[in-house]
Amino acid sequence: MLSSKKIIIAAGGTKSGKTTFLNAILAEISKLKDRVILIEDTPELQCSAEDCVQMRATTSFSMDDCLKQVLRMTPDRIVVGEVRSGEALALLDAWSTGHGGGCSTVHSNNARDTLTRLENMTARVSRNPQQATIAQAVNIIVYLKYAGNTRKVQEIVELEEWDPAAMKYRFHSLN
């Protein structure tokens, strides 16, 4: 999955293991010799790739600003620690311009809800619905859950397309 440069979203609630999962993905990506651009506002991710550029979003240089700069840095993979707001649209656009293999985290209640959360985040900066953009950019959603002091992968889905006639996403389970 990583060598085929699928875009992966690690989704789940607080303490579900999203960041730990992303760090495991980064450990594997680091073996591939790709240029990784890592963007975070809170430093939590570790990337041992030989060619890793880390960017920090701040109050004066936003996540959106970082994403606008990243395309000039010839990234092989764009990784964002956590998507929370309107920067989701800039990230989806970056992933949709030939920069596959990226990953990020999103807080959500299940894999399908992750898509709704992305729609809501992009709606903060665009009046146009972004379902087709989401379906073009995102390939895999890994939903993690924390229950009873354990963290586990509860669901893995592959997003196939946005069907405008049916007004729904088409995806299948990889569990």
Give short role names for the model-derived ranges.
Residues 135-175:
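Conserved P-loop NTPase
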Residues 2-15, 20, 24-137, 143-147:
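Switch/coupling sub-region of P-loop NTPases
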